[in-house]
Design a protein with these regions (language model features):
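Long, distal/terminal scaffolding or interaction modules
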Residues: 1-131
Length: 131
């Protein structure tokens, strides 16, 4: 398992470190709003501690992302497959245009959640909001 310290790392460098990791299990600690974590990821388990920025898991294609904290806007935008679990709240447009996969939110969501979700052939998107 690889552990990455986010801290004050700029989001582009943080995502390069995540993509470059050889392990399939990655833990990202001290996240303070870095964007696009796990975008387009396939066959990985990414654990996030902190507040994930915009676009968490956009275009996700089979990975699992678990956030111990909150996430900002556009979680799972255009997601194809995989799973996102947020043990907190998320901002606006969660699950926007998702085509498959599952999103579970423990807390509340902002506006326009699940807008343009669509099922196609064997892909059936699922979103559960606990707030």
């Amino acid at each position: 398992m690889t552990t990455v310290q986010a801290g004050l790392t700029y989001y582009k460098q943080l995502n390069e470190q995540i993509r470059a990791a050889q392990d399939s299990e990655i833990t990202v600690e001290n996240v303070i709003g870095q964007r696009y974590i796990g975008c387009g990821s396939t066959d990985r388990k990414i654990t996030v501690h902190g507040t994930a920025g915009n676009g968490l898991g956009q275009y996700l294609n089979g990975s699992t992302i678990e956030v111990f904290g909150n996430a900002q806007e556009a979680v799972g935008d255009t997601m194809n497959a995989g799973e996102i679990v947020v043990h907190g709240n998320v901002g606006d447009a969660c699950g926007y245009a998702m085509r498959g996969g599952k999103i579970y939110i423990k807390g509340d969501c902002g506006y326009r959640v699940g807008i343009h979700m669509k099922a196609y052939q064997q892909h059936f998107p699922v979103m559960v909001v606990g707030g």
